[in-house]
């Protein structure tokens, strides 16, 4: 296991081997949808090593048990990934280390006893109409500019379904005008590279205009994710919302409150959110009791003149 970093098999090199092997097997014995998770794990792992160790790669002999704990914290706190995404990244890391040991590139099977975090059992929920209006209308002191920006980013996500990672990276190049003069937001999601397209509501356009700045490349100023979580907590307190408030709820609220309740087909919502599988959208777009009652009333009205024929 001696030798320079150029000649020995290292963590990032082994990660490349695993990712390239998976990519080559797509369509043979691996589905296309499995690759993005590995690809983004590789990007996050490389970023973590550069951030934490100030180098581009590590030898397997340099790894300690603390490494995987620090990587988990980086993915959750710095990158803001959901627990299920972090769990998937950690599982891939363990697989890479297990393969390196099996092939003789590592003297030990690193992280074999590390327990993966439990999958989230709590389904993220959309805001109620009442909570949404409280956040929209809450008065924020002028000196709380960061709170104001956090609230407006949250509202923009409610109106567009844009995730946090995408909201702070979209630029004017992502804005398109259609033949009818309507403005659209089109982008590739950071999480999986899937295309997302959504027509901008007047409320979303107003927020873009509010933060328009020719000297800045992105459409909105950037708030780092740990700060965003802190602002969300403060925003909930200001608005008088007792439940926890997280940015991702805005994406669910777009699916349920803004689009599904307005009669938008779930297939269209899926395209707007950039989902590859409509079953994912079905988790986001939950029918509210209000929507259920309205649909039942429509059904009863439409069938009131029907006669049962036996």
Question: What do these predicted ranges mean?
Answer:
Residues 115-116, 121, 125, 129, ...:
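Conserved tyrosine-mediated DNA breakage-rejoining catalytic core shared by Y-recombinases
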Residues 299-310:
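C-terminal secondary-structure termini that scaffold catalytic or DNA-interacting sites
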Residues 126, 189-193, 205, 225, ...:
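Catalytic-site neighborhood detector that most strongly recognizes the C-terminal catalytic loop/helix
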Residues 33, 40-51, 58, 77-112, ...:
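N-terminal DNA-binding recognition helix of tyrosine site-specific recombinases/integrases
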Residues 190-209, 213-234, 246:
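C-terminal catalytic core of Y-nucleophile DNA break-rejoin enzymes
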Residues 2-42:
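Short, aromatic/basic-rich helix-turn unit that serves as a nucleic-acid recognition element
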Residues 83, 87-89, 106-164, 214, ...:
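Basic, Lys/Arg- and aromatic-enriched nucleic-acid-binding interface segment
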Residues 155, 159-166, 234, 251-276, ...:
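C-terminal catalytic core of tyrosine-transesterase DNA break-rejoin enzymes
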